[in-house]
């Protein structure tokens, strides 16, 4: 499982390989070549790694190999299947207008390669944000507002693929 978000990081997760004593993580910006080892995990029970060396708007390719020590010699198992991750740019709200019947009309920019957007709102900038909409739309009408209350909004783009990637 590989997940990505708009905070310029990719989190990789994998299933434990029997008798593995660690894992090597490889990344490339090409699907078939140019892979470089970006991390060595020294524990066979560690099954996640967060790559903070990515940039939004770029596509990366990852593969993982289990590592072993057999009779004092280091060895590596076969590579996992190469997985593609598109790190999406962050969505940005460009318009919030007051509509009829005390509603707010919120619009945001589309993000290339996004399959949808999650809009969340709160009544305090650093408060708990509640998801208001998850869809492919780039606008939302927020109704049932309380007069005199200030509302805060955040939007993030995501991409769902068959391999579970979400940005």
Where are these regions (language model features)?
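Extracellular low-complexity, O-glycosylation-prone stalks/linkers
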Residues: 19-37, 63, 113-131, 154
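Beta-strand-rich modules
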Residues: 51-72, 142-165
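Solvent-exposed loop/turn and edge beta-strand elements of beta-rich ligand-binding domains
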Residues: 32, 37-39, 54, 84, ...
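Short S/T/G- and acidic-enriched coil/turn segments that sit immediately N-terminal to beta-strands
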Residues: 45-49, 136-141
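Pro/Thr/Ser/Gly-rich low-complexity, intrinsically disordered linker/stalk tracts
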Residues: 1-19, 56, 72-113, 147, ...
């Amino acid at each position: 499982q590989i997940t990505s978000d708009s905070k310029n990081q990719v989190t990789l997760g994998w299933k434990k390989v029997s008798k593995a004593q660690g894992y090597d993580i490889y990344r490339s910006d090409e699907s078939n070549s140019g892979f470089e080892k970006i991390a060595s995990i020294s524990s066979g029970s560690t099954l996640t790694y967060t790559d903070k060396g990515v940039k939004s708007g770029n596509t990366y390719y990852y593969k993982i190999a289990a590592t072993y020590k057999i009779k004092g010699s280091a060895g590596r198992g076969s590579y996992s299947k190469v997985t593609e991750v598109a790190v999406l740019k962050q969505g940005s709200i460009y318009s919030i207008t007051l509509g009829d019947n005390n509603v707010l009309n919120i619009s945001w920019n589309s993000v290339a390669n996004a399959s949808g957007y999650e809009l969340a709102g709160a009544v305090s900038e650093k408060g708990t944000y509640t998801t208001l909409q998850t869809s492919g739309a780039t606008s939302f009408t927020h109704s049932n507002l309380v007069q005199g209350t200030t509302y805060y909004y955040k939007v993030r783009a995501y991409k769902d693929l068959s391999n579970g990637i979400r940005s």
